[in-house]
Structure formats: C-alpha cells, structure tokens
Amino acid sequence: MADPDGCISAKLYRGVADLLVEDGYAAKGYTWIDVDDCFLAKRNLATNELQADETRFPGGIPALAEYVHSKGLHLGIYNDIGPGTCAGDPGLNVSAVPDTRADAQLKKDAQTFASWGIVSSVGICVF
C-alpha cells in the first residue's frame, strides 16, 4: 500500500465515523458510511469466503462495523456482481443465467456480509 494513511482502511473509516458524530452530521441524519472498492483480499481458498485485506482492515470488517455501530451509525460496503470489482478485487461472480453454483456462492457471500454486521450494495463493473 503506497499511502496507508490516505488509502481505504479501517483507520480512515473510523475517522469518518468520529467526524460525523463530533461535527454534528449524524444528528442531522448523515448516519451511513459506505466502504467502496479495495477492501477485499482474495477469497479464502479453503472456504471460498470473501475476506477483508488484513493490512488495511486489521481485525476485519466486523471490527470496523462494531466501531461504526457503537457511534450510532450504519456501515455499508460495495461489491460487484461480476467476477471482479473495478479495482480487480473478487466480485460476487453471479452469472447472467442462474445456476446452482452461482446461487449458492451469492447466498454464501450474503451470509458473510450479514455475519460482518453490514449492508452490501452491489454494482457491476465491465472491464
């Protein structure tokens, strides 16, 4: 990571959460923080589950979600319905024609996001 203090990281999003509360934005309804691309490492090879980049997110996304929620805020996260995100991280890889493998993987990824205590937004990046 070229600039660990300026790149997407738990440190950055914790700071955003602090500012939303301390500067009064949360009281005015700004209660959502959305993590964009570049939060993922490669899938866990043993389980095929999505996993956060441990360098950027020590303790993973659940630790960040717990911090954000402790401030009375909500945490959302971006992913892509294709094989990869625009930055090349793993996507949800749902085929255009549903099959049991794609459906099972999508369900597993949704369960992973739910276990992290977050909401996922899904886009599509054609690259």
Tell where the protein language model's regions lie, with residue ranges.
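Aromatic-lined carbohydrate-binding/catalytic grooves of carbohydrate-active enzymes
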Residues: 2-5, 9-127
